[in-house]
Amino acid sequence: MPQVFIETPRLILRQWKETDHEPFIVLNGDKEVMEFFPVVKTREESLSQIERFVINIRTMGYGFFAVERKDNAQFIGFTGFAHPGFDSYFTPCVEIGWRLSKPNWGQGYATEAAGSCLEYGFETLSFCEIYSFTSVHNKSSEQVIIKTGMIKQGLFEHPDIEEGSILRQHVLYKKVESNR
């Protein structure tokens, strides 16, 4: 049984297990799920990503956790924390992010998972502030950010996205420990 970090009324956020690999590969290869990312991920890239997630959780006690529905024990995506690997006026920082499979969109799972993760970040991990960002075109993800109570900080050009790409401009949000 993988280590559970967070439980919500409908979800379990936990360490990754081998049975997550195939659905994660499908998730990362879904063009609609990956619409606001520069490219879909290959099988090898997805497996490498899982390996990094597992190592981060083991070594730091946090990272991107696998998200599982309680009602059917189905892997539906991930949510959790990372340290963006690019230079910007707000980095270094802790970022919260998520990605869920399309059949699980529109049911409040992303907000439930992200909200509980934010609480875990402040109460258990003692983070002082947590950022989130997404493409200005990703209105669904931005709505999740807003629903978790994060405060808009402005816009920035994502340095890892090619200049001229419609995905380059991002909206930035932040939540600080005192405004939870």
Which residues does each predicted region cover?
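Conserved GNAT-fold acetyl-CoA-binding loop/helix
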Residues: 32-53, 63
